[in-house]
Amino acid sequence: MKQTVYIASPESQQIHVWNLNHEGALTLTQVVDVPGQVQPMVVSPDKRYLYVGVRPEFRVLAYRIAPDDGALTFAAESALPGSPTHISTDHQGQFVFVGSYNAGNVSVTRLEDGLPVGVVDVVEGLDGCHSANISPDNRTLWVPALKQDRICLFTVSDDGHLVAQDPAEVTTVEGAGPRHMVFHPNEQYAYCVNELNSSVDVWELKDPHGNIECVQTLDMMPENFSDTRWAADIHITPDGRHLYACDRTASLITVFSVSEDGSVLSKEGFQPTETQPRGFNVDHSGKYLIAAGQKSHHISVYEIVGEEGLLHEKGRYAVGQGPMWVVVNAH
């Protein structure tokens, strides 16, 4: 398995393309100059394209991925109804979902043969919309509205329209600020990092019809932490055993172990990391974690070790200015 790591640096308007080897070392293979401030990125389900959101001219760009070395070639673009904060796709590669924090909306862009061809639906009134996350069964779109302390739930129709479910939302505690999410591989649990109180909620998916319950909330910060809480990103290993979340004020990654059924998180430790880590990701082998420092302009690679999933630094690399997004593609 070959793996390519993509790093989006909006301040220098670049994507750095790296080869990740089996020992956790990175080799720079390409630097792509992007026509705009590049932020969120996602790889298409068939691994043929990288979709990126850019500003200040709000667009989704599609880059063709070379199957041998992961190099990028521009392929297409499509306008968006708001500044892109988060980007994702459905599991069949039919639609791109874009959440916009500033516009307070989520949009659906249709794909034809992997290329974006236009927006087919927009839902407004999602104050502080920070991500759009398709459920494992490809039926439900989870959309955290950070400023409203709620996660809105939509059914995705065959033509890409979003239909509010019943119930149409679940709520967090007041002032939590739900932001980014991941799903357990067993498809029974979801985990949401809350930006404003730096906590992680565990949501049980009781059935595919919106019957969802928060079964655990964990503070992700050290006991003596008294500064402003400012959580950012969350990721889980492919085997579902280890979960990670980061806080930008403390510049640390919190390490959680996950119970076998996915229902319980246990805090295992903290890893100091790059300054203001807004984005990170876990590789497809579950052996390495790559974190980007928005203020350090570097990335660090960590090996995931032991039953606790603690992080051991393997290497550090300069990237573009203000790196914000990390994506790993296996090919």
UniProtKB/Swiss-Prot annotation:
Q: Would the keyword Hydrolase be found if you checked this record's keyword annotation?
A: yes
For this protein, what is the EC number? 3.1.1.31
Question: Keywords for this entry?
Answer: Acetylation, Carbohydrate metabolism, Glucose metabolism, Hydrolase
Q: Got a GO cellular component term for this one?
A: cytosol
* Top-level taxonomic group: Bacteria
A GO biological process this protein is involved in?
Answer: glucose metabolic process
Pathway(s) = Carbohydrate degradation; pentose phosphate pathway; D-ribulose 5-phosphate from D-glucose 6-phosphate (oxidative stage): step 2/3
N6-acetyllysine-modified residues are 287
Q: Is the keyword Acetylation in the record?
A: yes
Question: What reaction does this enzyme carry out catalytically?
Answer: 6-phospho-D-glucono-1,5-lactone + H2O = 6-phospho-D-gluconate + H(+)
InterPro entries, alphabetized: 6-phosphogluconolactonase_YbhE, Cycloisomerase_2, Lactonase_7-beta_prop, N2O_reductase_N, WD40/YVTN_repeat-like_dom_sf
Q: Which family does it belong to?
A: Belongs to the cycloisomerase 2 family.
* PANTHER family associated with the record: 6-PHOSPHOGLUCONOLACTONASE (PTHR30344:SF1), 6-PHOSPHOGLUCONOLACTONASE-RELATED (PTHR30344)
Summary of the function given for this chain in its UniProt record: Catalyzes the hydrolysis of 6-phosphogluconolactone to 6-phosphogluconate.
The entry's protein name is: 6-phosphogluconolactonase
Please tell me the species this chain comes from. Answer: Escherichia coli O6:H1 (strain CFT073 / ATCC 700928 / UPEC)
